[in-house]
């Protein structure tokens, strides 16, 4: 769940904030009253972070939401419907991007902002509902990693991810490797633009590093205030697909169906293929190794593929009719299938790999026991 409370892209947005806060700047002061302007969902302005009344009211609202989630799950057979809460949305922009508008320096804003994020995160952590907390950061200022570390080490925030809005595999790789260095952090791309045709490759790069990746967004509202943002969706605002929609859908189908192994395997045992160029190669072959297996993968149609070793099996898939040849293992059985929502492997059909050579069907996940 994305908790858009006091800050959305560093703004305080009227549409997300109760009227009694918007209309009472004495109790809930903002940084510079005459800096307010009308935007999507009404007034945009800059609430002063960590003021006692603001934190108290937002904490109460957040706590009520956590209670509602907890009660919902209890009524519905304890199904865990929420895995995490994002605290605010790109709150760092209040300290780093809107300074000219509100007149405060980053050094004046950061301490109170981090304390407030921590306090709100602790509301989630102290609730009866078990889930992680995260903050998403932008990457447009030099010290974003330092500030990400400062946020991640607080008691209330478990993880920090970034919103790079870049379609370079190398850039995504570099940012995730830096985030992995923060002790205890789950490095992840919290947002990246849905307009990028190579989101299939960018996501696979993240997964092959043992990290996470999220696309913003599936579809953008056609609201006239957001016309310039409609490029962000994987789909057009009228729900029609874009030119690259299907290849993203295909990739995320096989990621989803192999989710247990992607989530549990050591990242050194997750081999991603076709990650050498930002667009992916139309025809290419690559050889990679996991702990026990060697895999040679070949494509003639820009396949996006992976091989994951976990426990006593390899899980492999491609978005195209590719081929994998396996070395150093003795194959006992091959099954087509998927992992269900409870993490159980669902076998759908047997498969064969004569001479350890597997002719892969598009978007089919195979589990190979060895």
Name each region found by the language model.
Residues 322-341:
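Beta-strand-rich binding/interaction modules
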């Amino acid at each position: 769940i994305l908790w858009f409370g006091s800050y959305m892209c560093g703004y305080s947005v009227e549409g997300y904030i109760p009227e009694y806060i918007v209309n009472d700047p004495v109790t809930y002061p903002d940084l510079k009253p005459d800096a307010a302007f009308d935007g999507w969902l009404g007034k945009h302005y800059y609430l002063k972070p960590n003021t006692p009344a603001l934190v108290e009211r937002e904490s109460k609202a957040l706590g009520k939401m956590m209670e509602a989630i907890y009660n919902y799950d209890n009524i519905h057979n304890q199904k865990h419907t929420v895995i995490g809460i994002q605290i605010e949305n790109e709150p760092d922009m209040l300290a780093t991007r809107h300074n000219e508008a509100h007149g405060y320096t980053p050094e004046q804003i950061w301490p109170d902002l981090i304390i407030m994020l921590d306090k709100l995160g602790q509301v989630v952590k102290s609730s009866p509902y078990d889930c992680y907390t995260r903050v998403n950061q932008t990457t447009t200022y030099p010290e974003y990693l330092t500030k990400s570390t400062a946020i991640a080490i607080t008691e209330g925030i478990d993880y920090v991810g970034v919103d790079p809005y870049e379609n370079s595999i190398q850039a995504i790789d570099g940012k995730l490797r830096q985030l992995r260095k923060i002790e205890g952090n789950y490095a992840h791309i919290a947002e990246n633009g849905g307009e990028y045709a190579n989101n299939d490759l960018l996501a696979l790069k993240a997964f092959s590093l043992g990290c996470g990746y999220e696309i913003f967004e599936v579809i953008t509202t056609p609201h006239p205030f957001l016309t310039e943002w409609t490029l962000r969706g994987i789909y057009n605002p009228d729900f029609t697909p874009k030119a690259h929609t299907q290849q993203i859908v295909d990739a995320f189908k096989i990621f989803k169906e192999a989710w247990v192994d992607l989530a549990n395997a050591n990242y050194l045992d997750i081999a991603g293929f076709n990650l050498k160029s930002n667009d992916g190669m139309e025809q290419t072959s690559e050889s990679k190794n996991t702990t026990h297996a060697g895999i040679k993968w070949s494509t003639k149609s820009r396949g996006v593929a992976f091989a994951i070793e976990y426990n006593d099996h390899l899980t492999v898939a491609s978005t195209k009719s590719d081929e994998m040849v396996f070395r150093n293992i003795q194959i006992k059985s091959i099954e087509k299938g998927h992992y269900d929502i409870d993490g159980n492997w669902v076998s759908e059909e047997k498969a064969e790999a004569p001479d350890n050579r597997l002719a892969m069907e598009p978007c089919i996940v195979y589990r190979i026991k060895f």
